A protein has these predicted regions:
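Noncatalytic, solvent-exposed loop/strand surfaces
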Residues: 1-178
């Protein structure tokens, strides 16, 4: 963690990651972007799962193992956790058992886990989209864009896209998803 006013380090955490899978340069095992609610920082690493750290001192608050993703290509994991209210969402689309998961930010308990059996390896981070008075959790992957109920994980809608492997996240502006 870095002090935004001075640029000086506040604290640093290192993790024992175990054996890291091979990835193609210039990719990194730290490709995911952390999320923070101002009290906690949530980080994802493919060999650790999601770890919650205290923003003040870096102390580990909880850890949720997600299982190592299985990728046929050596690009490595890149999706990032997303916060909405007191829920943390993460999509692990891999070549064996893709799923979308919701965790309680306070303790890391699983609220729901929705399989995505028609998805192969993907690298997109979910986004929240509010349109027509409803907020959906939207995830791109394997030639589809899908919307889910963020409270239950139920798939609400799907839209076909042109690409099989999607590496970018959807962008939301007003009531439109790009």
């Amino acid at each position: 963690s870095t002090n935004p006013a001075t640029g000086k380090p506040l604290w640093k955490r290192e993790f024992e990651t175990g054996t890291l899978p091979r990835i193609t340069p210039p990719n990194s095992h730290a490709s995911s972007t952390p999320a923070s609610d101002g009290k906690r920082v949530f980080v994802y690493f493919s060999t650790l799962g999601i770890v919650a750290l205290d923003v003040a001192d870096g102390k580990e608050l909880w850890r949720r193992s997600l299982g190592k993703p299985a990728y046929l290509m050596d690009w490595g994991a890149a999706a990032s956790p997303v916060l909405h209210g007191d829920s943390l969402y993460f999509c692990q689309d891999d070549d064996l058992a893709s799923y979308l998961i919701s965790l309680d930010t306070a303790n890391g308990e699983v609220r729901w886990r929705t399989p995505r059996p028609d998805m192969l390896a993907g690298y997109a981070t979910p986004v929240m989209c509010t349109a027509g008075g409803r907020t959906d959790l939207v995830v791109a992957g394997s030639g589809k864009l899908k919307g889910y109920d963020p409270k239950t994980g139920k798939e609400l809608w799907t839209c076909n896209t042109l690409l099989r492997t999607i590496m970018t996240s959807p962008v939301v502006k007003d009531d439109i998803i790009y």
